[in-house]
C-alpha cells in the first residue's frame, strides 16, 4: 500500500526541522495576510538600524509589496541575485529613501536569515481561478516564499507534481507574496 501524501509531507517537515536545523515549522501561517505580516516583521527586525527603530508605516509597506509583484519567474530571479550580495527593497520615507535588506547572501545558513516551512497553505479562488488550491509544502527565507513542493506517493509519478505546479501557474496562484517562488 502506498503511503498517504499527508504522511510524506509530515516526514519532509520533520526532516527539515530535525535537530540543529535552522528551519522552523510555522503552522500558524495560513493566509496571505499572515504571510505578509510575517514578512513585514522579519524585514523590520533585520533592518532596525536602517529604520531608526521605527516600524514601517502601512503606506511604506505597500511600497515594499508593490516591489515584490514580479511579472515572471525570471524577473523574480533577477531580483533575488541582488546587488553586492544583498537583495533589497526601497522605501520613500518623507524626504529620505531607505534601502532595506530582504536577504544578505553573506548570511546564508546563519546570521540574520530566518528559515521557515509552511504546509497546506490555501490559495483562494479569484477571478482567474474559480477553485481554491492547497499547496503541499512551501519553504520561506526571511518570510518570503521561495520554494514550492508538491509531493506525490509511489502511486503517482513525480511528473504529476510538476503538472500540478504548471496548473497553479496557469491559474495565477503564484502571485502576490508567492510571485518570487
Question: What is each residue range found by the language model?
Answer:
Residues 1-181:
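An alpha-helical interface "stripe"
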